[in-house]
A protein has these predicted regions:
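Thiamine diphosphate
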Residues: 1-173
Length: 173
């Protein structure tokens, strides 16, 4: 049942980019996502981060791996449906080949007034169970107070040499 206050509120794209820069991120590979459009716009204009658009999530994960092997520090920006579309590639590259892969996952079709578990969108409801099934850790960013989860997710991806998802629960601002 919806409350009168949103469960998830937008997080500043400026703060997200600042966190990424503090972590040394130098490349972002993106499949455009309407939930993260302000983040994408800010990244596109940032001279310190190389921003590229891939055609598919599979391609983005492969580019991420190549950049990492080449000594770069990339992250991905995708939407929730991309998790489902690329699960075999997530298994093969970040999990099996042990490539750190931090994925910002926008919850396309999420109603920020409802908890994820109550969403009418199957894609919104099934992202976390899918990640759990494959052993992919995730953190939520539901409010500006969750911004520290970016650093936690980044460190976990590099400590475990694997994938970690940062689930963006409301459109970035």
């Amino acid at each position: 049942m919806p409350s009168d206050q949103p469960v998830a509120t937008g997080v500043s794209s400026e703060e997200i980019v600042s966190k990424l820069k503090n972590l040394g991120v130098d490349h972002v590979i993106c499949i455009p996502d309407s939930y993260q459009k302000t983040l994408i716009a800010r990244l596109t204009d940032d001279p310190d981060i190389s921003f590229m658009i891939a055609c598919t999530e599979d391609e983005a994960i492969g580019i991420n791996a190549g950049l990492y092997i080449g000594g770069k520090n990339p992250v991905l920006v995708i939407q929730n449906n991309g998790i489902f579309a690329s699960i075999n590639t997530i298994k093969a590259i970040p999990l099996d080949a042990k490539i750190p892969t931090l994925m910002f996952v926008g919850q396309f079709q999420r109603d920020p007034m409802l908890p994820i578990e109550e969403s009418k969108s199957r894609a919104v409801r099934m992202v976390e169970p899918t990640l759990e099934t494959w052993g992919v850790p995730y953190y939520r960013i539901e409010t500006p107070e969750d911004i520290g989860n970016i650093e936690l997710g980044y460190k976990l991806a590099y400590d475990t040499l694997g994938p970690v998802a940062i689930i963006i629960g409301a459109p970035t601002i």
